[in-house]
Amino acid sequence: MIQMALATEKALKLIESYNTLTLIVDKSDTKDDIKKSVERLFNVKVVKVNVVITPQGYKKAYVKLAPEYKASDIAHKLGIF
């Protein structure tokens, strides 16, 4: 499932500009698994999930939230923002 949230410069810009969280997830997770776990853990509605497997070998998920929810609020709860 979700291993950690990223707090890089790009991740913070995505939170502010696009209402998107950047998460490191298990390599076996599908987009549907990621969407369900984020919705359940944070009580939000997810619009879209994009995934990337990095050259370092971990899977990064970009999770876009519905407009009525703020990614900055969740980032604050996680201690990122």
Swiss-Prot record:
InterPro entries for this protein: Nucleotide-bd_a/b_plait_sf, Ribosomal_uL23, Ribosomal_uL23-like, Ribosomal_uL23/eL15/eS24_sf, Ribosomal_uL23_CS
GO MF annotation list: rRNA binding; structural constituent of ribosome
Lineage: superkingdom: Archaea
Pfam families: Ribosomal_L23
SUPFAM superfamilies: Ribosomal proteins S24e, L23 and L15e (SSF54189)
GO BP annotations listed: translation
Record keywords: Ribonucleoprotein, Ribosomal protein, RNA-binding, rRNA-binding
Cellular component, GO, one term: cytosolic large ribosomal subunit
Protein's job: Binds to 23S rRNA. One of the proteins that surrounds the polypeptide exit tunnel on the outside of the ribosome.
Subunit structure: Part of the 50S ribosomal subunit. Contacts protein L29.
PANTHER family hit by this protein: 60S RIBOSOMAL PROTEIN L23A
Similarity field: Belongs to the universal ribosomal protein uL23 family.
Protein name: Large ribosomal subunit protein uL23
Lineage, uppermost ranks: Archaea, Thermoproteota, Thermoprotei, Sulfolobales, Sulfolobaceae
